[in-house]
Amino acid sequence: MSSSHTIQETKEVHTKTNKRIQWDDLDPKRYYFYNFLLGGSIDLLMFPLDVIRTRLQVQGSQNVIQSFPQYNGTFDGFKKLIRLEGKRALYKGFLTSECGYLCSRAIYFGSYEFVKQGFLKGRSDSDSDLLFVTTISGAISEALASVIWVPFDVATQSVQIQGSLSKPKYKGGSDVFKKIYGERGIKGLYKGFGATIIRNVPYSGIWWGTYEISKSKLTQFNIRQKLGLKERSSHSLAVSAEIDKNNPSHEVENEDPIIHFISGFFAAVFATSITNPLDVAKTRLQTGVFPENEKPNFYTIIKSTIRKEGIRALWKGLVPSLLTSTPYSMISIFLYEEVKKLSLK
């Protein structure tokens, strides 16, 4: 990090005299470069769990052509997939997913920081204001990113559910785009868009609200001291005015990475558990094959699932979802907060 970002060494007790890092404090070029690098690296590690999650969520649905054997849980799914389809199958749809994810990620995080900064202006530092602003900002950023993400999500999941028990319909992600567009037009690529919004927007709002409140509470609780960890020597970071003359030099809070890590865990567990039924319905709606005279929607999918499989079916895939979202959330938010520090002007 350059000298303009030098951490101000101090042994003083942390206070709220330094503001949090905001959008105006960041250099966009560095911010987006580090975000792309970060997102791709984490996805490479976590994608296999996403394949298993998708298959678990669609198995048992009468509207999805199942070409893989019945999985009796996450680990059984891994065992059968590798044995029958090989290790490469763990990354089915990865390139398609990554193209959409990296583009939507840029919109998602950038819009979150920008919208949050706008909403926080003129508001107090109270937890209630923080919860409201971050929840709304998270929801808005997800809605914007979903416009880019949904077609790639449809293509990715269509490839992920193709097993070894029948001839695959699609050769890959690009083939999915070509065939779906040819058969159903742009509407086919946005199949389940409403369901995605209904699932992802609440998830994002709940996640960010939980995360930011957890950060605030853990800071007040002095979690580092409670865990018996060494006191940090630096509590502020310098922002230079060299890049943006309209944003004078000032200091921002150097937040504790331990707090980011723990808050990411709380946010993932809470948001994933609450919205899993919405995720099951979204996946089935996007990957299902329905009669021409049948026009399924979010409500009918959930109603049909409960009637035919019981209410517990709405939590299918929760374990792999938690195994994916929790470490992903903890690691990605920890690194994302560090990216913000590296991207200071």
Swiss-Prot record:
The keyword Transport applies. The chain crosses the membrane at residues 32-52, 89-110, 130-150, 192-208, 258-278, 317-337. SUPFAM superfamilies: Mitochondrial carrier. It is found in: Mitochondrion inner membrane. It is a multi-pass membrane protein. InterPro entries: Mit_carrier, Mitochondrial_sb/sol_carrier, Mt_carrier_dom_sf. Solcar repeats lie at residues 30-118, 129-217, 255-342. One of its GO terms (cellular component) is mitochondrial inner membrane. Induction: Up-regulated by phagocytic stimuli. Gene3D superfamilies: Mitochondrial carrier domain. One of its GO terms (biological process) is transmembrane transport. Keywords: Membrane, Mitochondrion, Mitochondrion inner membrane, Repeat, Transmembrane, Transmembrane helix, Transport. Belongs to the mitochondrial carrier (TC 2.A.29) family. This is Mitochondrial substrate carrier family protein J.
